[in-house]
């Protein structure tokens, strides 16, 4: 099976696996324990925080580890909203966010917060004017993902930072699909989230960063771990492996960019010959991501045919694909249900070979030839 679903998850690299096994074997203590074994684990945790902080140019005091980016989104957004609710209860996001973000805002609506969904253009992008038109006197937080997992569109977060600072509004971003692959304006953010398994790290580990200068309130009371941000013993082997994955992604970024750009242009050239539509922004996008529609074919059909031919692709974000309903992002960008049903996603990585990619291109050509339907 040729794997082309890197936006859903990525394989752990050999280096990351080695780090995980080594730390799991040698540093198995509870970092909250007061004996030497616990101290060794705690020391690994603090070393990892410092290493990540150096790579991302953030304060290690604001780093918290969670069980996933989904959990990190919930805890970060809720903790910030609770801490600032006396100032206001108005929150802003978009309908193009990851399901974990959308469900978090639905939860906050049930807790008497008021949520506005800023409109996006046909590429899923937010304009400064649209955002400014949504801000109110009681707005306390804006959450906009840096890159959209279904469409692949990258948001120009830096253009929002200045007006949000002017109005003293917190700025959160889900950077799960971006960090390690493209540049992210982290210094413009008050908080961000990311995931281990999206950058060739382990599953079951996410990261939340909240600027230590920003007040937050624990979602659960009485929690002693990680300053009360998240309950439970920190998984030190996963933290170490996650750190190694971030480190590796930064070290190999130039080689990654060259490889991904080559495959990107190769596929885009071929697309010009096909009855195919690229969703999301044509240029300001993740280069390893293609959100596509083939005229006259359902995405589910394309995905199943690809699977039968030995290629793993998807019909959208894996966190919502089991619901068998179009992602709300399609309604947000003005697509009909029929158009949304045509969607499928191809995403590749550093391990994807040119030979594998050419084989997938040949598969799509054969599929289109069988259909024989003009644009």
UniProtKB/Swiss-Prot annotation:
Active site: 319 (cysteine persulfide intermediate)
Family the UniProt entry places it in: Belongs to the class-V pyridoxal-phosphate-dependent aminotransferase family. NifS/IscS subfamily.
Gene that this polypeptide is encoded by: nifS
Function, in words: Catalyzes the removal of elemental sulfur from cysteine to produce alanine.
Organism name: Halalkalibacterium halodurans (strain ATCC BAA-125 / DSM 18197 / FERM 7344 / JCM 9153 / C-125) (Bacillus halodurans)
Cofactor(s), by name: pyridoxal 5'-phosphate
Entry-linked Gene3D superfamilies: Aspartate Aminotransferase, domain 1, Type I PLP-dependent aspartate aminotransferase-like (Major domain)
Modified positions (N6-(pyridoxal phosphate)lysine) in chain numbering: 198
Alphabetical keyword list: Iron, Iron-sulfur, Metal-binding, Pyridoxal phosphate, Transferase
InterPro entries: Aminotrans_V_dom, Cysteine_dSase, PyrdxlP-dep_Trfase, PyrdxlP-dep_Trfase_major, PyrdxlP-dep_Trfase_small
Catalytic activity: (sulfur carrier)-H + L-cysteine = (sulfur carrier)-SH + L-alanine
EC number(s) given by UniProt: 2.8.1.7
Protein name: Putative cysteine desulfurase NifS
Binding site for pyridoxal 5'-phosphate: 69-70, 177, 195-197, 233
MF terms in GO: cysteine desulfurase activity; iron-sulfur cluster binding; metal ion binding
Keyword match Iron: yes
Pfam families found in the cross-reference section: Aminotran_5 (PF00266)
Record: residues binding [2Fe-2S] cluster: 319
């Amino acid at each position: 099976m040729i794997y082309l679903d890197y936006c859903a998850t990525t394989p752990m690299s050999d280096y990351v696996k080695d780090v995980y096994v080594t730390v799991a074997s040698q540093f198995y203590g509870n970092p909250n324990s007061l004996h030497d074994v616990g101290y060794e684990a705690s020391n690994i945790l603090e070393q990892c925080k410092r290493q990540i902080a150096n790579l991302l140019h953030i304060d290690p005091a604001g780093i918290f580890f969670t069980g996933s980016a989904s959990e990190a989104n919930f805890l970060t957004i809720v903790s910030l909203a609770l801490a600032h609710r006396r100032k206001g209860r108005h929150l802003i996001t978009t309908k193009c966010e990851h399901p974990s973000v959308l469900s978090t805002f639905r939860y906050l609506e049930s807790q008497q917060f008021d949520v506005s969904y800023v409109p996006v253009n046909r590429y899923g992008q937010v304009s400064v004017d649209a955002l400014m038109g949504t801000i109110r006197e009681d707005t306390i937080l804006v959450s906009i993902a840096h890159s959209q997992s279904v469409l692949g569109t990258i948001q120009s977060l830096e253009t929002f930072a200045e007006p949000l600072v002017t109005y003293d509004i917190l700025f959160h971003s889900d950077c799960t699909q971006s960090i390690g692959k493209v540049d992210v304006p982290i210094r413009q953010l008050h908080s961000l989230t990311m995931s281990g398994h999206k950058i060739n790290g382990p599953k079951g580990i996410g990261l939340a960063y909240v600027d230590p200068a920003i007040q937050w309130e624990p979602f659960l009371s009485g929690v002693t771990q990680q300053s009360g941000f998240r309950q439970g013993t920190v998984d030190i082997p996963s933290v170490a492996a996650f750190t190694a994955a971030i480190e590796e992604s930064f070290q190999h970024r130039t080689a990654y960019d060259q490889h991904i750009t080559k495959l990107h242009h190769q596929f885009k050239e071929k697309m010009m010959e096909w009855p195919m539509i690229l969703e999301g922004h044509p240029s300001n996008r993740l280069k390893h991501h293609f959100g596509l529609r083939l005229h006259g074919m359902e995405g589910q059909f394309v995905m199943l045919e690809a699977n039968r031919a030995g290629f793993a692709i998807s019909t959208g974000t894996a966190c919502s694909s089991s619901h068998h309903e179009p992602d709300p992002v399609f309604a947000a960008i003005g697509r009909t249900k029929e158009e949304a049903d045509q969607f499928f996603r191809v995403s590749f990585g550093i391990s994807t070979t040119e030979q594998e990619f050419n084989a997938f291109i040949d598969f799509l050509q054969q599929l289109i030839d069988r259909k024989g339907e003009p644009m």
